[in-house]
Amino acid sequence: IFHQAGCDWTMPSRPGWDNSDMCMFTGDYEMMGRIKRAHFELAQKLRVKRIVMGECGHAFRSVYDQGNRWLGWKDSPVPVVHAIEFYWELINEGKIKITHQYEDPVTIHDPCNTVRGRGLADKLRDVVHFLCANVVEMTPNREHNFCCSAGGGIINCGPPFKSVRMEGNRVKADQLRNTGVHTVVAPCHNCHGGLEDIIKHHKLGMHTKFIGDLIYELMEK
């Protein structure tokens, strides 16, 4: 996608390239600050103009919200954007063109860290409607959408909590089932894991996709 859009980009090869941050889940804010410092220091050494975060909600929040504050920074030393924002820019600037739209009906899951936390509901929908011909909204949606069952790092607590997550979030299973679609667009890694667990446990016959999956599948190459 980066190459097709003609972006000038790089991927670090040293520590600091990955923003997965278990410290945010465990409450180890001192270590979280160290991880963020390494990330931004590496970005500054590379002299990049901004950091594009992948489709991961917790990593994004640990950068744009919590890591900065625990380091005592008012703003990030290097601007940070989520993949939703970046894809939106590429599409609106005409840098990504698609050969056709995705025809099967899809629904949109709103990740908490990008929609409630960052306010990206409109841009998320702009991107999905550009890519997909038939979008069916969940009810409720946007900032009122139901949790994926993986939030706050609970999915990483493993098997002992899985049955609680599955049975305790039947409301999400019902919400998904009521859309009548088979494809869920979820731009967050944790949400993918949580939704896939719900889909399998409740036998919903659905599958999940990242926005990047759809763009690569549909774009001119």
Functional labels for PLM-detected ranges:
Residues 1-221:
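Iron-sulfur cluster-binding electron-transfer modules in prokaryotic oxidoreductases
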